[in-house]
Curated annotation (Swiss-Prot):
Function: This is one of the proteins that binds to the 5S RNA in the ribosome where it forms part of the central protuberance.
One Pfam entry name: Ribosomal_L25p
Gene name linked to the record: rplY
Upper taxonomic lineage: Bacteria, Pseudomonadati, Pseudomonadota, Gammaproteobacteria, Alteromonadales
Species assigned in the record: Pseudoalteromonas translucida (strain TAC 125)
Database matches in InterPro entries: Rbsml_bL25/Gln-tRNA_synth_N, Ribosomal_bL25/Gln-tRNA_synth, Ribosomal_bL25_b-dom, Ribosomal_bL25_C, Ribosomal_bL25_long, Ribosomal_bL25_short, Ribosomal_L25_dom, Ribosomal_uL5_bac-type
Keywords per UniProt: Ribonucleoprotein, Ribosomal protein, RNA-binding, rRNA-binding
Protein name per the record: Large ribosomal subunit protein bL25
GO cellular-component term (any): cytosolic large ribosomal subunit
GO biological process, alphabetically ordered: translation
Cross-referenced PANTHER family: RIBOSOMAL PROTEIN L25/GLN-TRNA SYNTHETASE, ANTI-CODON-BINDING DOMAIN-CONTAINING PROTEIN, RIBOSOMAL PROTEIN L25_GLN-TRNA SYNTHETASE, ANTI-CODON-BINDING DOMAIN-CONTAINING PROTEIN
Length: 204
């Protein structure tokens, strides 16, 4: 569970639709929706500058986000973020309300440690996953999952089942069965630089 809190101010949005959303974006507002927890969906807006700053934090994508909406604090998680195809602008956000007594599905990043040790051995860690989909109660969401690669050698690999998840946290993929135990990484030996003779042979 994260010790950091993520709180953002939002305003209720009465006008919806493409035209209204376009006007809001011109005013540097980001249209968004809050849904879930057996309640009606609520249309809101956030300041674009706040969203741009928020997305710099890894926790914005994985942790509980408290939205202050019209005097009410609503606990949510981010479910979707839409961006402009070529401008550095966020165009829409989807938030899901959370219930402290119900498990949720979310994604947390993988932090790899010990890669410097592997590199000194002339090998490289090839990442095949950078995040894991998990199920847990809201308060148990970890900031990230750590994978230590320092003792791996060329030819080694790790799968989701090799990762030690925190107590109360389970893998969505593993719950689907053994066939969904995805590879997280493999370790490959670096190709040695060709000798002078090998380089000459290759040129002939």
């Amino acid at each position: 569970m994260s010790n950091k809190t993520y709180v953002y101010n939002a305003e209720l949005r009465e006008q919806t639709g493409t035209g209204a959303s376009r006007r809001l974006r011109r005013e540097d507002k980001v249209p968004a929706i809050v849904y879930g927890a057996n309640k009606e969906a609520t249309s809101i807006t956030l300041d674009h500058k706040d969203v741009i700053k928020a997305q710099e934090s890894e926790g914005f994508y994985t942790q509980i986000l408290t939205l202050n909406i019209g005097g009410e604090s609503v606990e949510t998680i981010l479910k979707d973020i839409q961006r402009h195809p070529f401008k550095p602008k966020v165009t829409h956000l989807d938030f899901q309300r959370i219930d402290a007594n119900q498990k949720l599905h979310t994604i947390v990043p993988i932090h790899f440690v010990g890669e410097d040790v592997v590199e000194k051995l002339g090998t490289t860690v090839v990442r095949q996953l950078t995040e894991i989909e998990i199920s847990c109660f809201p308060k148990a969401i970890p900031d990230f999952v750590t994978v230590d690669v320092s003792k791996l050698v060329a030819g080694d690999s790790l799968h989701i089942s090799d990762v030690a998840l925190p107590a109360g946290v389970s893998s969505i993929d593993l719950a689907k069965g053994p066939g969904h135990d995805q590879s997280i990484l493999i370790v490959k030996a670096n190709k040695s630089a060709p000798t002078e003779d090998e380089a000459e042979d290759a040129a002939e």
